[in-house]
């Protein structure tokens, strides 16, 4: 059964759910550019006001995946995405990007899906460019990068070209909509495991259940109670874990892993170059908060990737990857590999 955009808008005004097949239809209209900007703006605003349901988000993510340019990775064992929704307003250096190098050095395969900074001073694409990585790769080149280096960066605009049909609407609205939470749900390489940071506590339970509906294997959705979309050193972290089809929600604390609780204030950066310096300092094993938070997040990602049996074991593997110099070497490896495709 199809639904007209006008009927969908009325549904949101009445705070009623848009059903799965209806949401698929509406989202396809948006992604094809077949819905007027006025109606698209009204519907995504209406969804935000009534609060998007797990079913609506899962359907929207399904369509975004349909329209994506996919990266084919034949072996998805120990294959993980480390990603945040962004929008936490913390302006920290790129913790998840730093964690990618450590996680790959410790034996996982990482498909990092990211973009330039919008709410942050430095998005993952910005800091990778500052490091010398060529982010403008075709899907087959990203697949080769994962096979060769254990890491691949998927620059979102290259993989989600249909998003251009809603870009102007989103820009003009200037408020968060369903599209702000779809990015981490739509990894073009289809990584079955994920460490996903979110910008609000309510999203922990929502996003992990969306991933459950989308057929993911092992996912940890995290929210630092100090407002970070990462596993935090400055507060407890809420975790929603999907494993073996079951969801469990719990809290973790830095002290659980022998880490000191410290403020994340020292992790703030003003631009991509400052982020690059802090990232390299952490990977060069310089003692401090940056190294510790990367170790904590990479350890959690190694658990999500099923390389480690627990977060604690993952942290130990992450420490070894940094101390041995293997994590730092991964930066140079990715730079070298991606530069051969420079156009």
Curated annotation (Swiss-Prot):
Q: Which residues bind Mg(2+) 1?
A: 96, 230
Q: Which GO terms describe its molecular function?
A: anthranilate phosphoribosyltransferase activity; magnesium ion binding
The cofactor named in the record is:
Mg(2+)
Textual note on the cofactor? Binds 2 magnesium ions per monomer.
InterPro entries hit by this protein = Anthranilate_Pribosyl_Tfrase (IPR005940), Glycosyl_Trfase_fam3 (IPR000312), Glycosyl_Trfase_fam3_N_dom (IPR017459), Glycosyl_Trfase_fam3_N_dom_sf (IPR036320), Nuc_phospho_transferase (IPR035902)
Pathway listed: Amino-acid biosynthesis; L-tryptophan biosynthesis; L-tryptophan from chorismate: step 2/5
Q: Which domain of life is it from?
A: Bacteria
The EC number(s) given in the record are 2.4.2.18
Q: Which reaction is catalysed here?
A: N-(5-phospho-beta-D-ribosyl)anthranilate + diphosphate = 5-phospho-alpha-D-ribose 1-diphosphate + anthranilate
Q: Which Pfam families match?
A: Glycos_trans_3N, Glycos_transf_3
GO cellular component terms, alphabetically, are:
cytosol
Residues the entry annotates as binding anthranilate 1: 84, 115
Which positions does UniProt annotate for 5-phospho-alpha-D-ribose 1-diphosphate binding?
A: 84, 87-88, 92, 94-97, 112-120, 124
**Biological process (GO) annotations?**
L-tryptophan biosynthetic process
Q: Which UniProt keywords apply?
A: Amino-acid biosynthesis, Aromatic amino acid biosynthesis, Glycosyltransferase, Magnesium, Metal-binding, Transferase, Tryptophan biosynthesis
Binding-site residues for Mg(2+) 2, renumbered to this chain: 229-230
Q: Where does anthranilate 2 bind?
A: 170
Q: Which family would the database say this protein is a member of?
A: Belongs to the anthranilate phosphoribosyltransferase family.
What role does this protein play? Catalyzes the transfer of the phosphoribosyl group of 5-phosphorylribose-1-pyrophosphate (PRPP) to anthranilate to yield N-(5'-phosphoribosyl)-anthranilate (PRA).
HAMAP family in UniProt:
TrpD
Family matches, as PANTHER family? ANTHRANILATE PHOSPHORIBOSYLTRANSFERASE
Assembly notes:
Homodimer.
By what name is this protein known? Answer: Anthranilate phosphoribosyltransferase
Its lineage reads: Bacteria, Pseudomonadati, Pseudomonadota, Betaproteobacteria, Burkholderiales
Q: Which gene encodes it?
A: trpD
């Amino acid at each position: 059964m199809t639904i007209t955009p006008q009927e969908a808008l009325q549904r949101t005004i009445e705070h009623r759910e848009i059903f799965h097949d209806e949401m698929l239809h509406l989202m396809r209209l948006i992604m094809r550019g077949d819905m007027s900007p006025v109606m698209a703006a009204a519907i995504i605003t209406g969804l935000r006001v009534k609060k998007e349901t797990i079913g609506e988000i899962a359907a929207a993510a399904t369509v975004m995946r349909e329209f994506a340019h996919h990266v084919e990775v034949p072996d998805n064992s120990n294959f993980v995405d480390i990603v945040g929704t962004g929008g936490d307003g913390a302006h920290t250096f790129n913790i998840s990007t730093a964690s990618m190098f450590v996680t790959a050095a410790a034996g996982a395969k990482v498909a990092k899906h990211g973009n330039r900074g919008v709410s942050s001073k430095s998005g993952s694409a910005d800091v990778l460019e500052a490091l010398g990585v060529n982010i403008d790769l075709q899907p087959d080149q990203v697949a080769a990068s994962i096979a060769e280096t254990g890491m691949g960066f998927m620059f979102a605009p290259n993989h989600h070209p249909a998003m251009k049909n809603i870009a102007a609407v989103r820009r003009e609205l200037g408020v968060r909509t369903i599209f702000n939470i779809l990015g981490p749900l739509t990894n073009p390489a289809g990584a079955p495991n994920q460490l996903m940071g979110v910008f609000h506590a309510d999203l922990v339970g929502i996003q992990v259940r969306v991933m459950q509906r989308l057929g993911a294997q092992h996912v940890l959705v995290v929210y630092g109670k100090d407002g970070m979309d990462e596993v935090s050193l400055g507060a407890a972290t809420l975790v929603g874990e999907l494993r073996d089809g079951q969801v469990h929600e719990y809290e973790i604390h830095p002290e659980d892993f022998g880490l000191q609780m410290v403020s994340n204030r020292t992790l703030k950066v003003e631009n991509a170059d400052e982020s690059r310096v802090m990232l390299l300092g952490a990977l060069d094993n310089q003692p401090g908060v940056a190294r510790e938070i990367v170790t904590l997040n990479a350890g959690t990602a190694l658990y999500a990737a099923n390389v480690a049996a627990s977060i604690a074991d993952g942290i130990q593997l992450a420490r070894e990857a940094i101390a041995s110099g293997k994590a730092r070497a991964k930066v140079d490896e990715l730079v070298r590999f991606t530069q051969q495709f420079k156009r």
